[in-house]
Curated annotation (Swiss-Prot):
Cofactor comment text: Reduced FMN (FMNH(2)).
Catalysed reaction, written as an equation: 5-O-(1-carboxyvinyl)-3-phosphoshikimate = chorismate + phosphate
GO cellular component: cytosol
GO biological processes: amino acid biosynthetic process; aromatic amino acid family biosynthetic process; chorismate biosynthetic process
Protein name: Chorismate synthase
Keyword Protein transport included in the entry's annotation: no
Membrane-traversing stretches: none
Keywords: Amino-acid biosynthesis, Aromatic amino acid biosynthesis, FAD, Flavoprotein, FMN, Lyase, NADP
Species of origin: Kocuria rhizophila (strain ATCC 9341 / DSM 348 / NBRC 103217 / DC2201)
Family matches, as Gene3D superfamilies: Chorismate synthase AroC
Amino acid sequence: MLRWLTAGESHGEALVGIVEGVPAGVELTTGMVQDALARRRLGYGRGARMKFEQDRVRILGGVRHGLTQGGPVAIEIANTEWPKWQDVMSSDPVDPQVLEGRARNAPLTRPRPGHADLTGMQKYGFDEARPVLERASARETATRVALGVVASQILAALGVRLVSHTTAVAEVAVPEGAPLPGPQDVPALDADPLRCFDAETSAAMVAAVDAAHKAGETLGGVVEVLAEGMPPGLGSYVHWDRRLDSRLAGALMGIQAIKGVEVGDGFRTAQRPGSLAHDETLRADGSVHRVSNRAGGIEGGMSTGDLLRVRAAMKPIATVPRSLHTVDVATGEPARAHHQRSDVCAVPAAGVVAEAMVALVLAEAALEKFGGDSVAELVRNRDSYLAGIPESLRTSPELADPAALAALDEVRGDLS
């Protein structure tokens, strides 16, 4: 069983993540984690914090000489701005005179609409929002990206590779039916301002971000995560909480600012008749092929072995530069919300975080299915499982070719 946990605050000394259940022999280095965190800082429309935020990584345990040892893996991400915050965010009590007059210590009594501020104050009994926003901040996702590297390395040993990309920023969207990126396209995606695979759409997205910045607005969008090389049978239909799509949806909805998730064609499927909503199968070249992949690689809560496709919709960042109307809870008077440093558009970063969360869920499901205390044992178990599938049930991730589709139409005619 793979379990993960994060700790730390946005302006605390460090963020810490622990992932347990990692088999021995997984390749993992500090450089791999640093590279992933650098990808999280990418994207047109990011705020000033990305310019000076340097993620100093230390692997604290579970790894020796670049290989996991079978124990929990602990990763620390130090906060380079800690010297400015060490009194305000100190774990131990601080003399009030030391904090007196510090702007960073001023009570945040004007909760920001769309953030956790007001409800967090109600729930935990705080009289200001600082304790809420420090933990609720999307800065915490840096730790999940770091832990996602561990999961991605587990999946890589099984031949599963992930890629994320931006499909929409506000109303600017990649055209329906546009080519999908593959893992080999990651460098090109990371070089694109919005991590968009369509150059023309990317240029329009940049223009939309510029217009929003000028207007004092923020923008949301949609990201998609793809997983190639999936084995069939990850997840289960026997209980709701073991369904792979249920777990993926929960993990993605747990990312700050994500408001919707769809698998495969998702909500578009609801607009189609049943005959055009599902993936028919046929036999060709010695295996079963699906004619399409509208399901996005998941049927009945289990991976099909086809390309896994899942999307997440991100709302516009709630810290709007021109500040939204709120109430000052200290005075009860109308006010403008506190404006913390923020981005115009963080959709590209959301894709990297979504990729990490999908990796964690898929790695967890793979370890549940195949088991193994080492990578070698895990791979052997996977190979044994696949070899045990009867030939009549073996599927191919390749979609049926046009000739096979024509043959299927003939079969349809015969059956009717």
